[in-house]
A protein has these predicted regions:
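Conserved phosphate/anionic-ligand binding catalytic regions in large, soluble enzymes, centered on
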Residues: 11, 83-98
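Catalytic alpha/beta active-site cores
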Residues: 1-48, 260-266
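Alpha-helical scaffolding segments of alpha/beta enzyme cores, especially the outer helices
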Residues: 21, 25-28, 61-71
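Acidic, His- and aromatic-enriched active-site or binding-groove loops in soluble protein domains
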Residues: 3, 27-36, 101-119
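Acidic, glycine-enriched catalytic cores built around paired aspartates
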Residues: 45-48, 56-66, 73, 78, ...
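Short helix/loop capping segments that flank catalytic or ligand/cofactor-binding pockets
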Residues: 17-19, 52-53, 92, 123-125
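Catalytic cores of alpha/beta
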Residues: 18-24, 92-100
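Active-site lining segments that contact anionic ligands and/or coordinate catalytic metals
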Residues: 37-41, 77, 110
Length: 266
């Protein structure tokens, strides 16, 4: 008799930060460990965390979550598979699969991985047989490479700098997407976000609640609205301030090292 798998999903920034304590509560239960046969799948949401905190901050906390969960799983002898809810545009975690898997923490792939492919990219990736074969081979090759040749562990200096950068980036990002800001007035004026909710192309409503504010707008229409005007802003908003901080004399050498030696950052 096959049991229904339990796959926790961590999406927002708070979810990512609390993932370790939540999973520790589960893993500490002996009946739970036996129930899952010491195998756990964990899903990481990319769209919501990026909309919540900005791309840089979300990316670093997604990285940290995996690192922390792997350490925890080692203690309880649990085999972890990460399910990455990413793909499509850069604002939703999309990008070449080789670079994607190289940028994960060491030993987080380990011969297996799950990744979503959003509806809008299915046709372009798998609609033509030779292209589908190429894409699937790319996935296999990327998994093998990330398993046999994992990326290096980040240096303490790198971690310290990226922590500071993510805080600066998040504050800048959240300051911009404040409901009262000129930025949001700009978003409402130049993007077709209201029209998107009337299109029958999604599996869910464009808003979580029937309230006309940015917080209630789902992450996918948020990115999609910007994409319609060819302004891929969710992929970089807030990052400029963080890079300006890291480019100062104090951190410049560390920043150059990160770019050259750390696949997560480059």
């Amino acid at each position: 008799k096959n049991k229904l798998r339990v796959v926790p999903l961590f999406e927002t920034l708070d979810d990512l930060k609390n993932a370790k304590s939540i999973m520790k509560s589960l893993f500490s239960l002996s009946w739970y460990r036996k129930s899952i046969n010491y195998k756990q799948e964990i899903m990481i949401g990319y769209s919501d965390s990026s909309k919540d905190a900005g791309k840089l901050s979300a990316s670093w906390h997604q990285y940290k979550l995996q690192d922390e969960i792997l350490e925890l799983a080692k203690k309880y002898k649990i085999d972890i598979t990460f399910f990455h809810g990413r793909g499509g545009s850069a604002g939703r975690g999309g990008g070449p699969i080789q670079a994607t898997l190289k940028s994960q923490p060491p030993n987080s792939v380990n011969g297996k991985i799950r990744i979503t492919d959003q509806g809008e990219v299915i046709q372009q990736k798998y609609g033509y047989k030779p292209l589908a074969k190429y894409d699937l081979c790319s996935y296999i090759g990327a998994v093998v490479e990330a398993t046999l040749n994992p990326p290096p562990k980040p240096d303490v200096k790198w971690k310290k700098l990226i922590e500071a950068m993510t805080e600066i980036s998040m504050k800048s990002y959240r300051g911009n997407i404040n409901e009262k800001s000129d930025f949001i007035r700009y978003f409402r004026t130049v993007t077709p976000h209201k029209a998107l909710g009337k299109l029958s192309i999604g599996s869910r409503p464009s808003k979580r609640k029937n309230i006309d504010n940015i917080k209630s707008l789902r992450a996918i229409p948020w990115v999609f609205a910007w994409t319609q005007i060819r302004l891929f802003l969710p992929a970089w908003l807030g990052t400029t301030e963080a890079l300006n901080y890291a480019s100062s004399k104090t951190f410049k050498k560390t920043l150059i090292d990160m770019e050259k030696k750390w696949p997560f950052f480059n």
